[in-house]
Amino acid sequence: MTNDKEKRLKELNRMQYEVTQNNGTEPPFQNEFWDHKEEGIYVDIISGKPLFSSLDKFDAHCGWPSFTKPLEDEEVAEKVDKSHGMVRTEVRSKTADSHLGHVFPDGPGPNGLRYCINSAALKFIPKDDLEKEGYGDLKHLFD
């Protein structure tokens, strides 16, 4: 992963790098996926690992893409974040060890969670492109 990760890091734009590598936060309502409604999956911009599905996305009125759960729990790590004078739970990509966003206990759904994720940490794969992009094993989610 190291050489591949180094290559992908060089391909990131300034905001993507700031968010994923320096635990930054992009502006609300001024990011690619905050109101994105197309069906598909959201993958880690660095590792390419599937992280979230449009089926679990909802409008939290916060200005960032929000999800009720990750696609696979083993792909995300949670860590206590005491920055900015707050205590929050940071969400990180396990494979790439990059910052994704935060999870809050104020979401809808059975778990009551809201995964508030920076668009800059994600790449969207439309459901019709899952096969050609190498995520064909996830097509069943949209049947």
From Swiss-Prot:
Pfam families attached to this UniProt entry: SelR
E.C. no: 1.8.4.12
GO biological process, one term: protein repair
UniProt superkingdom: Bacteria
This protein's UniProt keywords: Oxidoreductase
InterPro entries according to UniProt: Met_Sox_Rdtase_MsrB (IPR028427), Met_Sox_Rdtase_MsrB_dom (IPR002579), Mss4-like_sf (IPR011057)
Domain (MsrB) ranges: 5-127
Assigned protein family: Belongs to the MsrB Met sulfoxide reductase family.
Official protein name in the record: Peptide methionine sulfoxide reductase MsrB
